[in-house]
Amino acid sequence: MKIAVTYNKEQQLRPLEEAEIIGIIDDEKKVVEQYENPAYNMSKEATMSVILDIGADAIVVKNQFLCPGSYMMSYGRLKYIQTQYNSLQEVLEHLNELKSAATEELNEEVYAEAYPE
C-alpha cells in the first residue's frame, strides 16, 4: 500500500495546501518517497491532483486537511487514514495501527471548510 502524507520541512503534518512535501510511504518496500509539492500555497484540490497522479492508495488526514473539493476528487480512489499524530515520525511509528483503521469515506467534519466564528 502506498500511503500519502502531507507535511512541512520539519516533518510536521500539514493540510494539503500548506504542505511543502508530499511523502509516499511504501509499506511493502519500507521506504518514504518524498516529493516537493508543486501546489504548495495554491489549493487543496491542486495538491490532491498531485497525490492522485503519484498513485497513492490511501492518505493520512486530520480535521480540515481536505476540503469538499479534494475529498470528492479522491472519493472512491483513496482510502482515508485519520490520525491525531502530528509528525511523519509518529505516523511511521504507528503505521500498522493506522493502516488497520483505513476507511473508504470520512465524516463531513473532517473535510468541511473552517469558517471563523
Label each residue range with its predicted role.
Residues 52-89:
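Mid-chain, well-packed structural core segment of small domains
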Residues 40-43, 64-66:
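Short beta->alpha connector loops
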Residues 1-42, 53-54, 80-117:
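Non-catalytic interface/targeting segments
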